Amino acid sequence: METTQTSTIASKDSRSAWRKTDTMWMLGLYGTAIGAGVLFLPINAGVGGMIPLIIMAILAFPMTFFAHRGLTRFVLSGKNPGEDLNEVVEEHFGFGAGKLITLLYFFASYPILLVYSVAITNTVESFMSHQLGMTPPPRAILSLILIVGMMTIVRFGEQMIVKAMSILVFPFVGVLMLLALYLIPQWNGAALETLSLDTASATGNGLWMTLWLAIPVMVFSFNHSPIISSFAVAKREEYGDMAEQKCSKILAFAHIMMVLTVMFFVFSCVLSLTPADLAAAKEQNISILSYLANHFNAPVIAWMAPIIAIIAITKSFLGHYLGAREGFNGMVIKSLRGKGKSIEINKLNRITALFMLVTTWIVATLNPSILGMIETLGGPIIAMILFLMPMYAIQKVPAMRKYSGHISNVFVVVMGLIAISAIFYSLFS
């Protein structure tokens, strides 16, 4: 009896210990969330003045952590190990709801994949012509080479995708922090002049209006919902009944890392410029690094900007691919199930990879202007799945009821509603 208890305790201790795979997933979560959008965040978040920026910095961790933890718990609440988000939705809310969420989940993740395919083609094309002084190959060939390169990693499976992302995080964070430190001597007091509750922001809106419209910027800057389902499934297979505790710990470390590195970079950029500079950068619709390179006449920043963007886009593309693949696979499986048919998962993954390769290549070649609008329309869907659906499940699903009664649940719902309302206001104003 004592031997059995001792072995059980030892087994629990080994499962509670931090593993190499935990570090890999922590960096994978970071890699999915922090994409090329971080290069626009100092402008979008800082243009409203210091007060909204400070409030957003305070809200960043709880907003990111509680929302993503809720979605992770939702995926883990399925009866059987190996169930992804689509299957858990169907289990809890029925076939119709499962089909709808699968469709919405795909159309929330997939357009972001298309945006990244266009972005990496534009960035490499610009880098070759401006920094390297080369004539880039025709857009169709260049985009095909880049997308095939990223899809080659996908071909080796989920573990390789997460591993590649975790490796790419190191140079990205390193360069981001070096840039933030490099800007410290340029810090000035101009941004601090906006530290007043009653002054109108540089955008022409009042403080609360500026803060309201800035919430979605923060939500999507730290969003990594497309990889959450794969993360939860992998950790449940690895840790069993201890998966929830382990996932919460990994999420916490990933989000602390996100908030500290990104907000340090944002504050360093904002403090090195004036509010007028930030407004000019927003007007020009260029990344903060492009503006800093021109502003401080620093060619080294001009060189670093596209390199950082390429790394950021690549790792985010890989993370969002997992979400888009899950959504596409879910739609195919549900469609076949309705006809009494099934498909082998490896075969389906190959079909999905081919579909993603062809469509991202076509879109990257054509570079359609409507893509930004499609991505924006996906915003409310992401916010609904990430913020509202898990909180609704806590009230309605017996397996989730143990998480009820926490003030953090109310906080997540409020932030979700604020984000969704602000997105719709921005769309139609």
Per-segment meaning from a language model:
Residues A67-V75, P81-V88, H92-L132, P306-M331:
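Hydrophobic transmembrane alpha-helices that form the core helical bundles
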Residues V154, F170-A200, M218-F222, V270, ...:
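Hydrophobic alpha-helical segments and their helix-loop junctions in multi-pass secondary transporters
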Residues K20, P42-V75, A97:
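Extracellular loop-to-transmembrane helix junctions
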Residues E83-F95, M258-T314:
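TM-loop-TM module centered on a large, flexible mid-protein loop between adjacent transmembrane helices
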Residues I120, V124, A140, L144, ...:
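Membrane-interface loop-to-helix entry segments
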Residues K20-I43, Y105-S109, A180-W187, S196-C269, ...:
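Hydrophobic, membrane-embedded alpha-helices of multi-pass small-molecule transporters
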Residues M26-T32, L103, M128-G157, P171-A180, ...:
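Transmembrane alpha-helical segments of multi-pass small-molecule transport proteins
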Residues M1-I43, F65-R69, V397-Y403, V412-I420:
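Membrane-interface "cap" regions at the ends of multi-pass membrane proteins
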